[in-house]
Amino acid sequence: MPCTTILVGKKASHDGSTIIARNDDGRFEAKRVLAHPAREKATTYKTVISHLTVELPGNAMRYTDCPNVSKSNGVWPACGINEANVAMTATETITSNARVVGADPYVRYQEKKGRNTKEVPGGIGEEDLVTLVLPYIHSAREGVLRPGAL
């Protein structure tokens, strides 16, 4: 079964709760639920897979996410909800759609090989989107616009 997410907004749930339910495709990966505090200061985030460093602004909202327990293959925070009550999922495996890749090709990580070459960081991958987007958005519209602003 492919990755599937069900989002229920506060106006659709019986008690006003925001609910997110999600499954992952592929092999079993243990997940955990984390609550990240709000952060006032700017910081940087380094992606595990593509080795890209991204500057993050201050005023990050408090949010939850569900990353893999092991970070060896990337963080993969599959879903989360922020303090503005915006829910997000991002790892719906965009890699399998050739039309998307044709319109927006990957910027692939290139490892340093030898003394005369440099490491070339890759682009932002689906495994980093929740971390880079969710703490900074107040609506679904902002969630669509933020990745393009990165």
Regions found by a protein language model. Give the residues of each.
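Short, charged, surface-exposed loops that flank catalytic or proteolytic processing sites
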Residues: Y136-E142
